[in-house]
């Protein structure tokens, strides 16, 4: 899959730009706050309708503009398509080949994009919400059903929490059963994904840091470590919610379930966020992202688009070189933002396009 061109209008600090891209490497450079990340954000929207920066849709619309427009010309398996996304104050509308999209399934997956940002560099040492967010994004890229299930789980969670806040025991069991069943399906999918990428993470970590390191991933869910399969997980989750019901009524919120789970990154038998050096943590995250790319390529038969948001400033020269060596061996299209082109390792890359970004304008150089 390749993004041939994009048009962006009234989006953050971008008034209007039209950009034609290289099929391999595209470098957007300029000072901070000029619009580099906004271009990556617009690309990501074409595949997900959401910002990877956790912004609300109305926050993406330029000041005093009625709506934003992002339009992409893509080439997927030899078929060219036009994807357009309108962001209005009242919601979003999508079109494919100028026809309205009525089902989300028709839109999602048209652009598979993997983001590697400074936020994700921090997930090895940060809080569990960073690792959950990474995990959910990674699974959704290869499984549209996961996104729908994720939405359903959080809808049920919201309903159950509303009952807990009101202190209503009547009807709580019905929501508990439904939430436990949806939560069990999420947990099984998360565990399956981690088991599939773990050998890849192990391989890439050794490529980066050398042999002799034992690498692992462990899904951590409070009180459910031994439950296997959807049925067992759902039953265990129901029992756990029942056991915590009095406490949850006091707090007005559901305290157990996938929305509270975590992933342990393990190096030589120790959780890396507690015991790993900064270099080990960054190597681990780099290996996890490489594994995600490799997994999606095997699953879909083609690599995703990769969005590297100012990663060169977060990695030392050796890890930058390892990442670029990996990317040179892939057939994927890569978009890189940076404030300093000299930090990039572009040696051996036969073709790339470079763009200067300043005050919301994008100029080929």
Swiss-Prot record:
Domain of life, per UniProt, equals Bacteria
Localization recorded for this chain is: Cytoplasm
Keywords assigned: ATP-binding, Cytoplasm, DNA damage, DNA repair, DNA replication, DNA-binding, Nucleotide-binding, SOS response
> Where do the annotations place ATP binding?
30-37
The GO annotation for biological process reads:
DNA replication; DNA synthesis involved in DNA repair; double-strand break repair; SOS response
A GO cellular component term found in this entry reads: cytoplasm
Extract the GO molecular function terms from the UniProt entry: ATP binding; single-stranded DNA binding
Membrane-spanning intervals of the chain: none
This protein's record includes keyword Cytoplasm? yes
InterPro entries reported for this sequence? DNA-binding_RecF, DNA-binding_RecF_CS, P-loop_NTPase, RecF/RecN/SMC_N, RecF_2
The cross-references to Gene3D superfamilies, in alphabetical order and at most eight, read:
P-loop containing nucleotide triphosphate hydrolases, RecF/RecN/SMC, N-terminal domain
Q: Which Pfam families does this UniProt record tie to the protein?
A: SMC_N (PF02463)
Principal location listed in the UniProt entry: cytoplasm
**Is Membrane tagged as a keyword?**
no
In the record, the note on similarity to other proteins reads:
Belongs to the RecF family.
Supply the NCBIfam families for this chain. recf
Function comment: The RecF protein is involved in DNA metabolism; it is required for DNA replication and normal SOS inducibility. RecF binds preferentially to single-stranded, linear DNA. It also seems to bind ATP.
Q: What is this protein called?
A: DNA replication and repair protein RecF
Give me the gene this protein comes from: recF
């Amino acid at each position: 899959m390749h993004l041939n061109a994009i048009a962006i209008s009234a989006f953050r600090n971008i008034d209007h730009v039209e950009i034609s891209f290289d099929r391999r490497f595209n470098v957007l450079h300029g000072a901070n706050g000029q619009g580099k990340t906004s271009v990556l954000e617009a690309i990501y929207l074409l595949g997900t309708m959401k910002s990877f920066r956790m912004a609300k849709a109305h926050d993406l619309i330029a000041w005093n503009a009625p709506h934003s427009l992002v339009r992409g010309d893509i080439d997927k398996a030899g078929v060219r398509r036009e994807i357009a996304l309108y962001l209005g104050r009242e919601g979003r509308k999508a079109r494919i080949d100028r026809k309205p999209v009525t089902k989300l399934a028709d839109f999602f997956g048209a652009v598979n994009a993997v983001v590697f940002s400074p936020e994700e560099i921090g997930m090895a040492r940060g809080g569990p919400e960073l690792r959950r967010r990474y995990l959910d994004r990674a699974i959704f890229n290869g499984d549209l059903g996961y996104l729908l299930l994720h939405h359903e789980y959080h809808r049920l969670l919201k309903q159950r929490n509303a009952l807990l806040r009101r202190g209503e025991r009547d009807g709580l069991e019905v929501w508990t059963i439904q939430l436990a069943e949806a939560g069990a399906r999420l947990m099984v999918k998360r565990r399956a994904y981690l088991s599939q990428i773990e050998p890849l993470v192990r391989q890439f970590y050794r490529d980066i840091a050398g042999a002799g390191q034992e690498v692992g991933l462990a899904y951590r869910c409070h009180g459910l470590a031994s439950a296997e399969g959807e049925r067992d997980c759902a039953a265990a989750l129901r029992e756990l919610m029942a056991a915590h019901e009095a406490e949850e009524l006091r707090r007005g919120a559901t305290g157990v379930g996938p929305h509270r789970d975590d992933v342990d990154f393990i190096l030589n038998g120790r959780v890396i966020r507690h015991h790993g050096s900064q270099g080990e943590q960054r190597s681990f995250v780099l290996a996890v992202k490489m594994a995600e790319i490799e997994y999606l390529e095997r699953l879909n038969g083609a690599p995703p688009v990769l969005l590297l948001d100012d990663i060169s400033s977060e990695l030392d020269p050796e890890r930058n070189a390892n990442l670029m060596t990996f990317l040179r061996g892939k057939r994927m299209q890569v978009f890189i933002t940076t404030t300093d082109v000299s930090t990039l390792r572009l040696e051996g890359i036969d073709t790339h396009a470079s763009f200067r970004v300043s005050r919301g304008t994008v100029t080929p150089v």
